[in-house]
Regions:
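Active-site-adjacent structural elements in enzyme catalytic cores
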Residues: 6-9, 13-243
Length: 243
C-alpha cells in the first residue's frame, strides 16, 4: 500500500512540478519541520514553484522557504507587485518583483497523505490530474475538516457584495462577463475576449480589484462554464459571494 502511494506521489510530482500544484504529505515521525509550519498537524504542504525569479531565490537559500499567501486573510489574492503594495503598504520592507502571475489563481492543493483528494481547486484542473493517476479523485474543497488554507466559506473577497450566475445586473452593479461584447455601458467588464477560461482565470482578481477601486459597491457575474479551470473560477466567486 505504501509503495503504491509512493509511486502515485512520484508520478504526479514528475508530471506537474514545478507548477501550480501543492502536495499535502504525511510527516515522518522524526521530522524536523517546525510545528509552526505544520500548525501542529501530522501533514505538511509542499510546493515547487515555476517562476524563474523565485526558483533563483530558492537556489540561493540553504533551506526550504515557508511562506504564507501574499494576501490578507479572506481578502483578494495579489497577483502582481502593485497588488501586494496596495494590500500591505508599509508593512513590507521588500517586494520581489516578478511581474504578474501567469495563471492568476492559487495552486491546486492535492492530499496525497491518503487516497488522493483535492483540498482546493486551483490553477491545475482536476481532469489533468485524473489522466495521470487514472483514479477517481474526491473533491473535498468544501469539507468541514480544513487541513488546508483557503477553504473557509468566505475567502478571496473584494469586501463588497458579489452575485453569481446573473443574467441581468441591477442598477449600479458592475457586471462581469466571460466574453467581450459590443455593449455601450461603462458598467460592463470582460474577463476574456473570446470565452477563454484560462485567460478569464488570469484576469479574475485584477478585474475584481479594478472594479472595487473604481468605486463600485456591488458586483454581478454572469454564469461561468463549470469545466476545467472554470471550476476554480466558480469556487473563488462562490467564496467571495459569502461577504
Amino acid at each position: 500500500h505504501r509503495s503504491i502511494r509512493r509511486q502515485r506521489q512520484m508520478c504526479i510530482r514528475d508530471r506537474f512540478s514545478p507548477g501550480p500544484i501543492t502536495y499535502v504529505l504525511k510527516l515522518k515521525k522524526n521530522s524536523k519541520i517546525s510545528k509552526f509550519v505544520t500548525n501542529n498537524k501530522n501533514t505538511v504542504a509542499i510546493r515547487f514553484p515555476k517562476h524563474k525569479l523565485l526558483r533563483k531565490l530558492l537556489k540561493v537559500l540553504s533551506y526550504p522557504l515557508a511562506a504564507p499567501s501574499a494576501n490578507i486573510s479572506s481578502k483578494l489574492s495579489s497577483v502582481q507587485p502593485s497588488d501586494v503594495k496596495e494590500e500591505f503598504g508599509r508593512k513590507l520592507k521588500y517586494i520581489l518583483k516578478g511581474g504578474r502571475c501567469s495563471i492568476g489563481v492559487e495552486s491546486t492543493i492535492i492530499n496525497l497523505a491518503d487516497n488522493p483528494s483535492i483540498l482546493r481547486l486551483g490553477g491545475l484542473s482536476v481532469s489533468k490530474i485524473k489522466k495521470i493517476i487514472k483514479k477517481q479523485i474526491l473533491i473535498k474543497n468544501k469539507s468541514k475538516n480544513k487541513i488546508s488554507p483557503g477553504l473557509f466559506s468566505l475567502h478571496y473577497s473584494p469586501g463588497i457584495p458579489l452575485r453569481m450566475n446573473v443574467k441581468k445586473p441591477n442598477e449600479g452593479e458592475a457586471f462581469v462577463l466571460i466574453k467581450k461584447r459590443k455593449i455601450n455601458s461603462k458598467n460592463y467588464f470582460f474577463l476574456s475576449k473570446n470565452n477563454n477560461l484560462i485567460k478569464a482565470a488570469r484576469n479574475l482578481y485584477p478585474l475584481i480589484r479594478k472594479i472595487k477601486n473604481k468605486g463600485y459597491k456591488k458586483i454581478a457575474v454572469e454564469k461561468i462554464p463549470n469545466i476545467g479551470i472554470g471550476q476554480t473560477i466558480n469556487d473563488r466567486l462562490e467564496r467571495a459571494s459569502k461577504y
